[in-house]
Amino acid sequence: MNLYEMIIDENELMSGVNALSLVESPAIGSDWVALGDQKPILLAEVNADKQILMGAALIPDKPIYRNMNGEEFYIYFSEETVAKAAEMFFKRSNQSNATLEHSQPLKGMTVFESWIVDNPEFDKSKQYGLDVPKGTWVVSMKVDDKDIWDNYIKNNKVFGFSIEGAFSNVLRSESAEDIGLSDQLLDGALDLIRTFIKENIN
């Protein structure tokens, strides 16, 4: 199965991440933490319901399964591309661009905090229960729309972020295992199984 690296062409105006979407099944296999419901003890009395989401926007070197018109393949983002995507997201003032399931534009959504994980063991995201590798792009999003929070976040209709944007691709291998990503592929397969169970066994 072909493996493509996704890259950013800085000469293309639309290249990179243009928006974040709230989705039921994040392709990167990482759910968010709803800080209105799960608060660290030190902040528990500050605000009962902050309506803030924290989660991974992009995880580096993690193969993501794709099927387009019957063609199956994997894509991945390098650590360098993840960092560049995060930087350009803010440079182009896209922090208020959000959608629901990649279809419905949302208002009142703002990414106010963003960072690249340097040391997973001591990263801020760890205290909120996120377990992501070095190089992951983590964001915090304020949800000002109470209807979205109540109907989709609190009711567990969406579970994570999914990026929207345009990327170029480079074929890196006709077999993902050739570049030493077999463990990540196994993780990706497990994520697909978990998604199937979540969607079909309720």
Please identify what each model-predicted range represents.
Residues 1-199:
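Signature of dsDNA virion morphogenesis modules
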